[in-house]
């Protein structure tokens, strides 16, 4: 019985250490180079026809589910020229998302380097979207 208690305590402790909060993950993997937009704020402005919503996940992820109105941008196969065809103005309001907000920051940085000026990263990505 004593051994069983130690095993349970050991696995319980290692599991809790392995779990990180979303904030910890984003602080660890992101540079915070792109401002975030909350899921709540996006929900308020989502129907604005001037907003461009880009899904930076892989094609299979996009095909399974995506936020209504989002355009597929991809990550590994991201093509700036292809995406630029759908964004006429460098000042357009662009919101990029992925699963959590890590890949989307990379894509947003690429867009920023290409001269786009009004980009936000969906905090928590599609997993935080309700």
Describe the role of every protein-language-model region.
Residues 6-52, 59-63:
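Flexible, polar/low-complexity N-terminal or interdomain linker segments that lie immediately upstream
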Residues 45-53, 68-69, 92-94, 117-118:
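Short active-site oxyanion
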Residues 38, 74, 123:
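Short loop/edge segments at beta-strand edges and connector loops
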Residues 52-81:
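A glycine-rich, hydrophobic loop/mini-helix early in the fold
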Residues 78-130:
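Catalytic cysteine-centered active loop of the rhodanese-like fold, especially the PTP/DSP P-loop
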Residues 1-5:
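Positively charged n-region of N-terminal signal peptides that target proteins for export
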């Amino acid at each position: 019985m004593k051994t069983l208690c130690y095993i349970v305590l050991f696995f319980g402790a290692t599991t809790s250490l392995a779990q990180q909060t979303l904030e910890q993950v984003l602080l660890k993997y992101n540079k915070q180079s792109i401002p975030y937009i909350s899921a709540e704020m996006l929900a308020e402005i989502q129907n604005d026809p001037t907003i461009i919503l880009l899904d930076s996940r892989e094609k299979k992820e996009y095909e399974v589910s995506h936020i209504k109105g989002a355009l597929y941008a991809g990550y590994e196969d991201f093509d700036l020229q292809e995406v630029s065809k759908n964004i006429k103005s460098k000042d357009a309001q662009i919101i990029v998302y992925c699963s959590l907000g890590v890949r989307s920051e990379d894509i947003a940085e690429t867009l920023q380097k290409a001269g786009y000026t009004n980009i936000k990263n969906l905090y928590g990505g599609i997993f935080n979207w309700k």
